[in-house]
């Protein structure tokens, strides 16, 4: 059986396809670039490598050896029975989304701090109301849950606004690039929350991060604190957050939710204390993101074909 690479990514340009085909040919792979998952299905029985975020493809590829998600988050791939080939390795595209998602973080923060949703509602009613007190990132105390690519890129951008400090939380306690003023492990999280004005979450959805922010943590935050979540919705206990917002505490900028799409009954749709976007912070219509996805994959594709370890391989037991 010949080696086979199957690619299903939206927004690929011709130059991306050409580079993928060239790399595949160099290492003796047939390359099938498909516009949809449905189109890819006839190639799956012989697929050795798949580049796609559609976890359902892994269950239809009995000869799969490597599944590379073009997303950074891989939680759908971690469920029991997803892979038809249990020994298949899994990797992600961490490093592709830092630019676009960090810009989304800044947008959500400024939207809330500068009261833009309220101004827009007033404008739609042709009401010229100018006296809405605003706040600033300048001088704010920032805590970032997650110090990977997204957290680091956000930290770089937020430094320009001159906050009082930017602290981080990760599972290793290391300070990547010494970007953060201080980094702690999750065991110290509660002790950091009382001194936090802006809480920014970019953590993956894993067993260890499930409801890391729930009622006890929300109650430790100052009432004026802003929570931004661009990681996974399961990191925040959504019901607990909704209750705090309804009680007039906290503000939230959310791109991810516990269940997606967000239920039409959710109070978040109409909450004056929330700004929501429909999981679009990492949208691949930004060509820089697709460029990065392809570059990162080709780097690991060469590693795979030459017997070297993958740089972005996921430990499926912990989810990152």
Where on the chain are the PLM-derived regions?
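Glycine-rich, N-terminal phosphate-binding loop of Rossmann-like dinucleotide-binding domains
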Residues: 54, 71, 201-204, 230-231, ...
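Short loop/helix-cap segments at secondary-structure boundaries that form the rim of catalytic
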Residues: 18-22, 41-44, 57-62, 78-85, ...
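Rossmann-like dinucleotide-binding domain for NAD(H)/NADP(H)
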Residues: 224, 230-320
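Glycine-rich NAD(P)-binding loop of Rossmann-like domains
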Residues: 120-153
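Oxidoreductase and adenylate-handling cofactor-binding alpha/beta cores
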Residues: 102-118, 160-161, 295-303, 308
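Rossmann-like adenosine-cofactor binding region
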Residues: 164, 173-267
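Phosphate/diphosphate ligand-binding glycine-rich loop within oxidoreductases
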Residues: 46-120
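N-terminal glycine-/charge-rich "phosphate-binding" loop or analogous flexible N-terminal tail
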Residues: 1-47
């Amino acid at each position: 059986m010949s080696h086979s690479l199957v690619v299903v990514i939206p927004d690929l340009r011709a130059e991306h396809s050409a580079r993928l085909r060239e790399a595949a040919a160099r290492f003796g792979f047939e390359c099938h670039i498909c516009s949809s998952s449905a189109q890819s299905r006839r190639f799956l029985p012989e697929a050795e490598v798949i580049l796609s975020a559609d976890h359902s493809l892994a269950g239809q590829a009995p000869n799969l050896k490597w599944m590379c998600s073009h997303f950074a988050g891989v939680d759908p791939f971690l469920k029991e029975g997803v892979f038809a080939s249990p020994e298949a390795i899994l990797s992600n595209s961490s490093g592709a989304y830092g630019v676009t998602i960090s810009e989304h973080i800044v947008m959500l923060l400024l939207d809330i701090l500068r009261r833009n949703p309220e101004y827009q509602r007033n404008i739609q009613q042709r009401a010229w109301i100018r006296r809405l007190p605003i706040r600033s990132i300048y001088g704010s105390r920032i805590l970032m849950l997650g110090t990977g690519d997204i957290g680091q890129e956000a930290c770089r951008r937020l430094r320009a606004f001159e906050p009082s400090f930017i602290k981080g939380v990760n599972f290793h306690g290391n300070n990547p690039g010494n970007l953060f003023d201080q980094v702690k492990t999750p065991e110290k999280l509660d002790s950091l929350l009382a001194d936090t004005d802006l809480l920014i979450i970019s953590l993956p959805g894993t067993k260890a991060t499930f409801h890391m922010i729930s009622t006890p943590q929300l109650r430790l935050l100052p009432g004026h604190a802003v929570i931004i979540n661009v990681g996974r919705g399961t990191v925040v206990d959504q019901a607990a957050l909704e209750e705090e917002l309804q009680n007039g505490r906290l503000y939230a900028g959310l791109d991810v939710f516990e269940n997606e799409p967000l239920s039409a009954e959710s109070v978040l749709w109409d909450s004056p204390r929330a700004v929501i976007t429909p999981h679009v912070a990492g949208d691949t219509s930004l060509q820089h993101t697709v460029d990065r996805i392809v570059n990162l994959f080709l780097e690991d594709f060469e590693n795979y074909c030459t017997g070297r370890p993958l740089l972005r391989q996921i430990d499926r037991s912990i989810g990152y």
